[in-house]
Amino acid sequence: MTEPTFAAADTDLLTEPRLVVEPGVAARVAAVAEPVLQGMGYRLVRIRISGEAGCTVQVMAERPDGTMQIEDCEAVSRALSPVLDIADPIDRAYRLEISSPGIDRPLVRRTDFERHIGHLVKIEMAVAHQNRKRFRGIITGLDGDGVCITRDDVAKDQDPSVVLPMTDIGDAKLVLTDELIAESMRRGKAAEREKKRDLGLAPPLAPHAKPAAQAKPKPKLKDGQAAKKPLPTNTKKHRLAADRARRGEIDPD
């Protein structure tokens, strides 16, 4: 495995601030964890402290491109565990758990919303917007400091489009759909290919390589049937006729 480094990763993505942050003890853990993660080339997504089965501190992290492999989680755990032991932000015994954001991940940064335009999201506002706090819909884009969604739960006489101020968002999470699963699998395969190239297990991309052209659909007639292929115009008969025409002869046909 090749761990990302601060020099190799995109600096702007690594240092991009989170819009959704934790309160209380989780905030103290985040203050310790985030510099460690950034130094390794990872981004902090979320800290969650659970009292189930004792105390579990979940640190959700990712690479700047949004991926996170098992090897990445293991590397973060080895680096972060001793730092947390020294800083001691929690006053009781706990179990440290490092995880990826998952497919139906939380959206905590502006770039998270940008990457998932076209996908379904559930948003809970910390500050009510249009007299409501909960919204659900398709992310259609960004407008300044707001995220644009098309709601799927509105009445017929209501405008489904709404722009939510990102600074007022308390929680945002993707909704698991077939399209989201397919997109996640595509990104995972791309990350795996990139890792193999980094390890020398796969050939690098050729500089002139181009994506395969998509097959064009056959033209359709009005009745829905495929159009017939036009007759060839460069047969031996056509060539002989052209020669006779050039010589001024009359084509018997």
Swiss-Prot record:
The gene is rimP. Gene3D superfamilies: Ribosome maturation factor RimP, C-terminal domain, RimP-like superfamily, N-terminal. Required for maturation of 30S ribosomal subunits. This is Ribosome maturation factor RimP. InterPro entries: Ribosome_maturation_RimP, RimP_C, RimP_C_sf, RimP_N, RimP_N_sf. PANTHER family: RIBOSOME MATURATION FACTOR RIMP. Residues 201-216 have a biased composition (Low complexity). Belongs to the RimP family. Residues 186-199, 240-253 have a biased composition (Basic and acidic residues). The keyword Cytoplasm applies. It is found in: Cytoplasm. HAMAP family: RimP. It comes from the Bacteria. GO terms for cellular component: cytosol. The keyword Transmembrane helix does not apply. It holds the Pfam family DUF150_C. Keywords: Cytoplasm, Ribosome biogenesis. Residues 186-253 are annotated as: Disordered. One of its GO terms (biological process) is ribosomal small subunit assembly.
